[in-house]
Amino acid sequence: MLPKINTIVYACDLDSKTQAAMELVLSLAKTHGAKVILMHAIEPLNAQASNMINNYITEEVRNAMRKDAITDINTRMDKLLAEFMEKYSEELSSLETAPETLIVNGAPADSIQRIAKEKNADLIVMNSRTHGRLSQMIIGSTANKVIHTSSIPVLVVPIK
């Protein structure tokens, strides 16, 4: 028997070039009657940056900045999802449940795999690369790590 896709985790970097991947995710969800989890991972600062910030910014200000960043990411994810839902409302009216949005703290590759396991995902979808200069030349390091370490199938969508 062929495997059933019940849950799809789409690891979204909130770039403006995510349309192709989002279209594919929503198409797969519609075809398979799958639940969609749209997630974004907030990468922690490295030790040097963290020490510098801790030396110059109070904990109260740091917490406020983090809260603002999470609010901004939530807003961007909701906007991205709303735009797709509006654009494809007719085609997506058959989705059993509205996509869930999730923001997690941690290294992206590890967070993607953790969420996929926690949510019993059958498929992870992600873009081929991030928006950094060096990563534009090759497959993104996050996608590369997930591809090589995930026990869940990974679909990588090229950014055009």
What are these regions (language model features)?
Residues 58-77:
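A short acidic, glycine-rich active-site loop
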Residues 123-145:
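Glycine-rich, Arg-bearing micro-motifs that act as flexible, cationic patches
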Residues 39, 100-104, 155:
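General small-molecule cofactor/ligand-binding pocket signal
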